[in-house]
Design a protein with these regions (language model features):
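Non-catalytic terminal/accessory segments
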Residues: 1-278
Length: 278
């Protein structure tokens, strides 16, 4: 096993520095590189460059005894113009991709303009709720205030990461399911327990935070953080983001790392994307 820290350092040299050099020397259109641990997203303005980078990346990784997982590597149409170009060719909606717990979707605003939306991945929410359910069984006989304080921490932590614009439905669903699990746990404490919906609803109002969007739209955050690097942050042609993603760029000669790497290559004007594992 290679520790996450060592794996991250390895990929910094094996991928990040090399990718940044490729962008400087080869890219003629916009190109954005995002990596968080072993998750990678690369955005392109031009489809041809996305395909050339994909080939070059495979060759680069082979030098370090790494390879892209064939089933988890995709080149997809995605971005501002993806829906229009696919509709002109008689195809369906643009494909989605997952990154750091979110599903990224080509959506529209209330005004009908393009809007990149992030939704909590259903499997991640189910896993979190199952974890909470198991913990509630252990805490079943704790005093209600103690349970309430713990559940408040759980819900607050979930919201702190997932409370992004356009994800309000997932926040409400998570809080609702937490309330249901709490009620079920209270009713199991005793056959005579009368934990009605009205009573548990009041407990939820007392202890569980209400759904609230906590993060700004990515273009607002990026425009402040990278005003020079990204002059068109307000009206992007290519935009890949994630609340916790950190951008790196890489090249190393060590051959110790063997863990899989996720990647997505996105092109917006000619919308294409690639998902990968090593």
């Amino acid at each position: 096993m290679v520790s996450p820290l060592l794996a991250n350092l390895y990929l910094h040299y094996a991928f990040d520095l090399w990718a940044a050099r490729w962008r400087r020397r080869e890219a003629t259109g916009d190109m954005i590189i995002v990596r968080y641990a072993d998750d990678i997203v690369v955005g392109f303005e031009k489809e041809a460059e996305a395909r050339r980078f994909w080939d070059a990346m495979r060759a680069r990784l082979r030098e370090f005894s790494l390879s892209l997982h064939p089933d988890k590597t995709r080149l997809i149409e995605f971005g501002r113009f993806a829906a229009v170009t696919r509709r002109q060719r008689g195809l369906g909606k643009p494909e989605t991709f997952s990154f750091l717990g979110f599903t990224f979707i080509c959506g529209k605003s209330w005004q009908g303009h393009f809007q990149l939306k992030r939704k909590t991945r259903p499997d991640r929410m189910r896993a979190k709720l199952q974890e909470l359910k198991d913990e509630l069984r252990w805490r079943m006989h704790q005093p209600i205030p103690e349970q309430g304080r713990w559940l408040k921490q759980v819900v607050t932590g979930f919201f702190a990461y997932h409370a992004v614009p356009a994800n309000g439905a997932a926040l409400s669903a998570f809080r609702y399911h937490v309330t249901c699990l709490w009620r079920r746990s209270l009713r199991r404490r005793s056959q005579k327990d009368a934990s009605t919906w009205q009573r548990v609803g009041k407990l939820a109002d007392d202890w569980l935070p209400k759904p609230k969007i906590l993060h700004p739209w990515p273009h607002q955050r990026f425009a402040v953080k990278y005003p020079r690097w990204e002059p068109y942050a307000g009206v992007p042609h290519v935009r890949i983001w994630c609340s916790e993603a950190s951008c790196h760029s890489s090249g190393c000669k060590s051959r110790q790392h063997r863990s899989p790497v996720d990647a997505v290559v996105i092109s917006s004007d000619v919308p294409i994307a690639l998902e990968a594992w090593m």
